Each structure stands twice: as structure tokens, then as C-alpha cells.
């Protein structure tokens, strides 16, 4: 009975965990996907690395296209677009389309 009450108590609970690029590198150390196709976690890590590279070049955003990300991740365009849309729904990424180019920005705190 206590376990059920505890589950109900946290049913609507939302939790945000702040992570760092270094943590992601640590988590992936020694991990190698046997397929060329990226997992969602690998694709998200790739976005973190792309955002970091953009910031190093003093850009706030990642410039590219869904096709470019699709090729890098070995996904089809629909899957890539749906993934970015899902990340938008989670509030993790902001997306702006300029013609056929996608401008992405991870909603991150720099410190």
C-alpha cells in the first residue's frame, strides 16, 4: 500500500537534471554502436557537440539542414525531423527554418 501511495505522489512530478558535455563524453566512453545508424542518445550527443562547436566559433546556433543531420545519423529525413520536433516539445531545442536550412539551438546554460 505504501509503495502505491509513493507512486501516486510522484505521478505528476517533473524532474530536470542539468548535465555537462563532459558527463556525456564519460557516459559514451567505451560505447560503440555496432550499426552506423545512430541511437536517439547518440544523435542528442551529436547535437551537444555541434552546439559546442558553434559556440567555439561564436555562433549561438547550429546551422544545417535536416538532410545534413539525416546523413550524419544514418536516418531518413522524416525520422530526423520527428526527433527534432520531439526535442522541441521537451523544451530542449529551439528550431527555426530558413528556407531549406534548419537553425537549431540547444536551450542550454553556458557557464
What are these regions (language model features)?
Residues 1-68:
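Short recognition helix of helix-turn-helix/winged-helix DNA-binding domains
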Residues 51-111:
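Winged helix-turn-helix DNA-binding recognition segment
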Amino acid at each position: 500500500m505504501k509503495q502505491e501511495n509513493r507512486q501516486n505522489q510522484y505521478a505528476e512530478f517533473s524532474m530536470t537534471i542539468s548535465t555537462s558535455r563532459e558527463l556525456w563524453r564519460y557516459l559514451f566512453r567505451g560505447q560503440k554502436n555496432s550499426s552506423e545508424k545512430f541511437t536517439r542518445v547518440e544523435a542528442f550527443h551529436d547535437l551537444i557537440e555541434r552546439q559546442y562547436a558553434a559556440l567555439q566559433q561564436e555562433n549561438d546556433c547550429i546551422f544545417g539542414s535536416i538532410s545534413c543531420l539525416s546523413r550524419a545519423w544514418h536516418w531518413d529525413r522524416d525520422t530526423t525531423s520527428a526527433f527534432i520536433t520531439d526535442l522541441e516539445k521537451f523544451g530542449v531545442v529551439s528550431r527555426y527554418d530558413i528556407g531549406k536550412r534548419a537553425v537549431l539551438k540547444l536551450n542550454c546554460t553556458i557557464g
